[in-house]
Amino acid sequence: ISINTLAPMFVARAFLPDMLKRNRGHICNIASAGGMLGNPRMSVYGASKWGAIGWSDSVRIELQASKSNVHVTTVAPYYISTGMFDGVKSSIIPILKPEYVCKRVIRAIERNTRFRGIPFGFHFIRFCQAILPTTIFDFIFGKVVGIYHAMDEFTGRKRIDTGTSKAS
């Protein structure tokens, strides 16, 4: 929670006064598709990214109401092949390559996109949650898309002993 939710808040708050003084700037927070829907074995991660999404959206609305030329983009990518999610299985939606995500993030910033789910279309999860009964939503995303079982074989990034940790 400190890294995924609080750190982006503190970084943005450090730069925001100068952006407001210049009346230009852009805050881009990288959240996660995991912050858009519940997912077994990801409750804390999902909650931390949900916090980043909510905070970013609130700041965006505040800046918009003040007629500021400072913009906010929130990006919610699916799993990215960085090693962090080693072992994740995705039946329909491909695991994303970092280069692909970077290009989409840059494009979203250049276009002042408020919210970008990656891959495209993934941002419609919110819409689906709003209009579908929970049982139907869970069936589609859990059984058909397979998101609720993506973490079944999760191993995560392998830890490397750097020799810097102290023995207890």
What are these regions (language model features)?
Residues 9, 45:
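Catalytic tyrosine of NAD(P)H-dependent dehydrogenase/reductases that use a Tyr as the general acid/base
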Residues 12, 48:
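Active-site helix of classical SDR
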Residues 14-23:
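A short helix-coil junction within the Rossmann-fold of NAD(P)-dependent oxidoreductases
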Residues 32:
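Residue(s) in the substrate-gating loop at a strand-loop-helix junction
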Residues 35-37:
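Conserved catalytic-site region of short-chain dehydrogenase/reductase
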Residues 39-43:
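Active-site loop immediately N-terminal to the catalytic Tyr-X3-Lys motif
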Residues 62-124, 135:
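SDR active-site lid
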